Amino acid sequence: MNKPNSSLRAACLALLALTLFACSGEAPESDSADEASIYDTSLNMQELMALVLEPASDILWDSGGWVLDSAGYEELYPTTDDGWAYVRAQAAVIVETGNSLALPGRREDNDAWLIYSQGLSEAGRRAMAAAEAQDEEEFFQAGAQLYSVCTACHQAYNPEILYRFDDAINPVD
């Protein structure tokens, strides 16, 4: 009589373990209040935007594209490996800010908020990849994507911020 080989025995044991695990039911969901307490979300939304997201976004926008004015034509893209590494690091801040906005205790309680948060991270990842490749056009497009996500989110959650410079542009007499 032949004995089953050890690999067949191991496969059978693995299948048995997987079956038992699958039949054990779902893990209990954690209470969202308990889940939120493990994250430090002490920065309020205004602080998170002003101290984290806006500076990183401004660096990306100031580092992509070109300016043509009375002084002439100027390209804004980084010109050194260190410059590209710097904007890549700022793009990583944007990725992680998107993640931070989705944390329990900070996120709004609807799907749109998560879509905007994920869109922010996606734009940041796109900018990171473009910076790593030193691809000026793709970096510019990543900045445009970032702008679109920010504008759409502000329209939904903070529309008055879209008009914050109106008085400076058209002063009231």
Indicate where each model-derived feature is located.
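Bacterial N-terminal signal peptides that target proteins for export
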Residues: N2-C12
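Processing junctions and N-termini across compartments
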Residues: A17, A144-Y147
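C-terminal motif of bacterial Sec signal peptides marking the signal peptidase cleavage site
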Residues: T19-A22
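Bacterial signal peptide processing site
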Residues: S24-A27, T151
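Extracytoplasmic c-type cytochrome modules immediately beyond a signal peptide or single-pass transmembrane anchor
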Residues: P28-Q145, P159-D173
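The canonical Cys-X-X-Cys-His
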Residues: L146-Y157
